[in-house]
């Protein structure tokens, strides 16, 4: 869901950079030594998943995995996503360096929101936890789409048509991400339940 370089206004870019700085600072403060491998693995997964993208106007449609990252990382999703986006901008010119802050916020902020919204349900057993895991994947993409839409509309009314295309293009991705998040949640619950217990204690 990268916003291409040269699209957003300076005010939106500055605001995104400021919010990203705050989010990354909080994420680094909450990052403990034991969580570093988990953060690194999910950052790498995000990097690979979002490389396969389809251009939709000024935005690329692709898997984001931010619902999953929110489920497993919380605030540390901010530095994880920032590192992946920085490498993509540097190596492949995806999103560009000037839009790094906005792109980080549009993908990491929903991850944090998902973490706090669903963690009380993810602690439970049975169907409710599974529904929450699926909803976490869907919500991450939905909120990212809305934030991208807000950034584009704030920049100019000319992007309204592009906003509609972006939101429509991400509907199937929402379902895919919900299924992926649910599958990984159930896998961890069965194979490594202590990981989830440590996150949601």
Residue ranges with predicted function:
Residues 131-142, 149, 155, 159-201:
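C-terminal transmembrane helix-loop-helix hairpin of multi-pass membrane proteins
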Residues 43-47, 77-90:
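Small-polar-interrupted transmembrane alpha-helices in polytopic inner-membrane proteins
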Residues 51-59, 83-114:
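Interfacial aromatic-anchored transmembrane helix boundaries in multi-pass membrane proteins
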Residues 11-14, 36-41, 78-82, 100-105, ...:
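Hydrophobic alpha-helical transmembrane segments
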Residues 1-68:
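Hydrophobic transmembrane alpha-helices
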Residues 14-20, 108-117, 175-187:
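Hydrophobic cores of alpha-helical transmembrane segments in multi-pass inner/ER membrane proteins
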Residues 103-148:
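Short helix-perturbing small/polar motifs within transmembrane alpha-helices
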Residues 69-76:
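Alpha-helix C-terminal capping segments
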């Amino acid at each position: 869901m990268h916003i291409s370089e040269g699209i957003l206004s300076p005010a939106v870019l500055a605001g995104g950079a400021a919010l990203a700085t705050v989010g990354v600072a909080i994420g680094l403060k909450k990052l403990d030594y034991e969580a570093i491998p988990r953060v690194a693995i999910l950052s790498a997964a995000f990097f690979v998943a979002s490389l396969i993208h389809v251009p939709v106007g000024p935005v690329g449609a692709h898997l984001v995995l931010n619902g999953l990252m929110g489920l497993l990382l919380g605030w540390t999703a901010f530095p994880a996503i920032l590192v992946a986006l920085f490498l993509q901008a540097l190596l492949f010119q995806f999103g560009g360096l000037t839009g790094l802050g906005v792109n980080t916020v549009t993908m990491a902020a929903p991850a944090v929101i998902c973490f706090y919204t669903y963690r009380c349900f993810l602690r439970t057993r049975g169907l409710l936890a599974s529904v929450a895991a699926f909803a976490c994947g869907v919500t991450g993409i939905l909120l990212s789409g809305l934030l991208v839409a807000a950034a584009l509309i704030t920049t100019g009314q000319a992007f309204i048509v592009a906003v509609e295309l972006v939101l429509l293009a991400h509907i199937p991705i929402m379902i895919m991400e919900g299924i992926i998040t649910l599958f990984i949640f159930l896998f961890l619950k069965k194979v490594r339940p202590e990981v989830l217990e440590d996150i949601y204690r």
